[in-house]
Amino acid sequence: MKKEQVVNCQFSVWYPLFKKHTIKSLILPIPQNVIDYLLDDGTLVVSGSENNNSQTQANNSDSDEEDIQWTDDETTTTVTAPEFPEFNVKVQEAINVLGGCIFPKLNWSAPRDANWIALNSSLQCQSLSEIFLLFKSSDFITHDLTQPFLHCSDDSPDPTINYELVLRKWSELIPGGEFRCFVKENKLIAICQRDYTQHYQHIGKQEASISTSILQFFRDNIQYQFPDEDFVLDVYRDSSGRVWLIDFNPFGEVTDSLLFTWEELTSGKNLTANQTQEETALPDGPAFRCTNSEVTVQPSPCLSYRIPRDFLDLTTGEDAYKLIDFLKLKRGQQEEEEESNEEGEEPQ
């Protein structure tokens, strides 16, 4: 895997080429001070919200006496999050353009390993503060910012990366409709269900039609149009059988090979379908693998990512002030949602 392949898989590189085949998205350059904030290993205090209006303060007046008085203890230091008012305005405007709810990511990765921290265990965001909460809790995002060229074989200097916040219009995607496709020398050689930790009966039953529709989509819209001849693409097949492009990834170890191995994919040896699927495999078509029974269901790989030290402290009671910060953030988010509901606003 070469560094150029990684560069070509950046969202801003491929989106202009394939935007009519994917989810509507907006791309915003990230200021350096925001990048510094995301890389800060300090206490998880989330910025990006400017909703401390007088109405909220009035609603909280009855409970002011119960709040922790930070200034009463001279040994206590108040930890406040930096604010980025100009960036916050741009992000909120973009979110509104996309309907009010978005799915965030950086140049390459989304914070899929951090959905456990969200109130609804979802990557759906409506504000910059919610995006920051996910980003600062994600090892995937940290990898993008610090080691984007890990596993690259060339010794050339690392290309300069201009980091960007990608906001994708929120869409309810059924995990059983997501598939990862492996392309070598501009040929689709393998397809695998994206969420291989679960068994979806419809995938096994519709394997032939799924393979056919994905292969046709690849030939009509992707083949020979991506800058590299070796790459990985994620697609979504909806209930009507239409295929949508979701993402591109480098063809190499930095990308999860799911139910295949990288030795199989790079050598082409033993690159076959599951034994139970060989009868339905397309002649000269891609190898197709899926989790074919409940017996082979596996735990999600995201469960292996450790909880940040800050939250370990919360559970053990070692840092009460971090717990207070976290609870105040959650209370603020809940109050904002309640105010929106009272005003009759509904997410689009």
From Swiss-Prot:
Q: Where does Mg(2+) bind?
A: 247, 249
Q: Tell me the superkingdom of the source.
A: Eukaryota
- Which cellular components does GO assign to this protein? cytoplasm
Enumerate composition-biased segments (Polar residues): 49-61
Q: What's one Pfam family the UniProt record gives for this protein?
A: D123
Signal sequence residues: none
Q: Where in the cell is it found?
A: Cytoplasm
The protein's matches in InterPro entries, at most eight in alphabetical order, are given as: CDC123
Annotated ATP binding lies at: 105, 108, 110, 112, 168-170, 178, 180, 194, 234, 247, 249
State the Gene Ontology terms under molecular function: ATP binding; magnesium ion binding; protein folding chaperone
Swiss-Prot/TrEMBL GO biological process terms: eukaryotic translation initiation factor 2 complex assembly
Q: Which UniProt keywords apply?
A: ATP-binding, Chaperone, Cytoplasm, Magnesium, Metal-binding, Nucleotide-binding
Question: What ranges does the record give for the region Disordered, renumbered to this chain?
Answer: 49-68
State the similarity comment.
Answer: Belongs to the CDC123 family.
What's this protein's function? ATP-dependent protein-folding chaperone for the eIF2 complex. Binds to the gamma subunit of the eIF2 complex which allows the subunit to assemble with the alpha and beta subunits.
Q: What is this protein called?
A: Translation initiation factor eIF2 assembly protein
